[in-house]
Amino acid sequence: MTLFRSSLRLRLPVTLLSPPPIHKHSRLFSASHRLFTAAEMPVDTSQRLAKLRELMKERHVDVYLIPSEDSHQSEYIAPCDARRAFISGFTGSAGCAIVSMSKAALSTDGRYFNQAAKQLDENWLLLKRGMENVPTWQEWTAEQAEGGKVVGVDPSLITAAEARKLSDTIKNTGGSLVGVPDNLVDLVWGGDRPARPREKVMVHPIEFAGQSFEEKITDLRKELTKKKRAGMVISMLDEIAWLYNLRGADIPFNPVFFAYAIVTHSTAELFVDEAKLTQAVKEHLGDKVALRPYESIFESLKLLSQAAASNGDEGHQKFLLSDKASWSLNLALGGEEKVEEVRSPIADAKAVKNAVELEGTRACHIRDGAALTEYFAWLENELINKKTVLNEVDASDKLAQIRSKHKDFVGLSFDTISSTGPNAAIIHYRAERGNCPNIDPNAVYLCDSGAQYLDGTTDTTRTLHFGKPTEMEKKAYTLVLKGLISIDTAVFPKGTTGYAIDAFARQHLWRNGLDYLHGTGHGVGSYLNVHEGPMGIGTRVQYAETPITAGNVLSDEPGYYEDGNFGIRIENIVVAKEVKTPHKFGDKPWIGFEHVTMTPLCQNLMDTSLLTAEEKKWVNDYHTEVWEKTKGFFNNDELTRNWLKRETQPI
């Protein structure tokens, strides 16, 4: 079997990296399609690991890496790409599996420590990322490579930058990194591997997009001219969907489709399975975008690189490639000599919503807030007044049904987190149908949910208690609420990053020796991925490099979690905007936030003695706004209207 070493100057064997055949796949865009759940017992991975090690031995690989991402570096993936989950049994969205001939380790972050501990069997070591004296997965891999061992990875599943950094780390212990074009986990999976999805691609109308795809391509070409580059190769699925004003359903909850794109100064191409395109899509693209087979991307890159080499202008021989694009794409274009790795200008443009997208975001959050209000009123009535026994999935199914009644609803934006009591402490918990607890009205109930509407994407978390909360539960909730308010009311000079304001949300917890192991905020797409970059609020390096800009849409979601006891999280979506200030130091614009989430907070969990007068006013003003913007949905629904009226009374 052909291997290629970690030098990025080597060419990729195109024939070896063609994607697997595309087969018909059922639509996966709703809560009824739960592939994995946090409540599952560990899977026995012994046979899977044994088969993988046999393949490693055949290919002279001593250590094999299984990242979470697909060949487009997607955070959320199609079932056919859930390789790390298959080999390890751990189903969280983030992590990396490392398998040597005698050991196996799984590294993940604080969101998933509890889940991973439950799902990994005795074959696996859990590496808790960021914890003291715990090696990173790169360091652990390098340790296993000591003495000249070979580390292998599918080059389509990591970026070129990751490959370079990892190669250097491994070399320090005497090992080496190679790319293994045929994915070994796919070979272990065999015929049981889910088929590749072939869902239809649809046009995203200008009434929701706010800008034509022709205008977006023109803007991108201006960037190419500015940087003196021949073109840009695009592999991130949400960037392709946004650029061409198209949407799909190939990945659960994310309205994207498998494709690549190339834009030069004179051409625009879309590499996609043409059978997925409706006639409306073909008419939409017209003669402005050339259609190519999805599988032909690597051969096209080789030809493109050769054509650029004949250009006399040395600067125009290089192509822009996102720093998130795969190592295999980088090599196919010619490596460092032909590629400039950049933060994608498309990602930056997409993150700054236009006026139409912002109006859509506001409108869909009002409708979504009404849906959540109806749901919480129903849930309290069932649990308290009717004494109905409901489990976590029963409840989330009802929420999905309520949401589906609203205008322009398409589906959910992620699998609803419906968690009672100690399950609320599992940050990314998933209730298992047929094997989840009943909701305890005398315990905390945390609901993190969202939806896809044609005019926007929503993501809201509310923590409620229908009985008598403990003093610690009330204290924790109120400290988290203070953090949410601190972000909501923050004002800062243009150029400030989300890294810089993350402590605003944590300060109240920190004063009490408390904290949470996740970011405070992420970007949100416009009828696109619920997690969107490049900006965010947290301690990631990327967040320190990306200023928050007017037009960004972000979550504001501090939390607190006690393992085995309870969890608290409150989440609103906010829009960054320029604000007026009494003064203007440095003659800079100043940035603040506008909240768009319209769902009542839980007064039963508030310890108002911990709130300042300003914070109480914020809560009262917020609840007045929620009441005014959503009460009209309940003119014929006395139960919900009365619940909304009660929950929005002044504190």
From Swiss-Prot:
Provide the reaction this enzyme catalyses.
Release of any N-terminal amino acid, including proline, that is linked to proline, even from a dipeptide or tripeptide
Keywords from the UniProt entry: Aminopeptidase, Hydrolase, Manganese, Metal-binding, Metalloprotease, Protease
> What gene does this protein come from?
AMPP
- Write out the residues that bind Mn(2+) 1: D459, E557, E571
Q: What is its EC number?
A: 3.4.11.9
For the ligand (Mn(2+) 2), the binding residues are D448, D459, E571
In its keyword annotation, does this UniProt entry include Repeat?
no
Q: Name one GO molecular function term.
A: metal ion binding
Q: One Pfam family, short name please? A: Creatinase_N_2
Question: Does the keyword section mention Protease?
Answer: yes
Q: What is this protein called?
A: Probable Xaa-Pro aminopeptidase P
GO cellular component labels: cytoplasm
EC class of the enzyme, as a word:
hydrolase
- Chain's role: Catalyzes the removal of a penultimate prolyl residue from the N-termini of peptides.
Which domain of life does the protein's organism represent?
Answer: Eukaryota
Textual note on the cofactor: Binds 2 manganese ions per subunit.
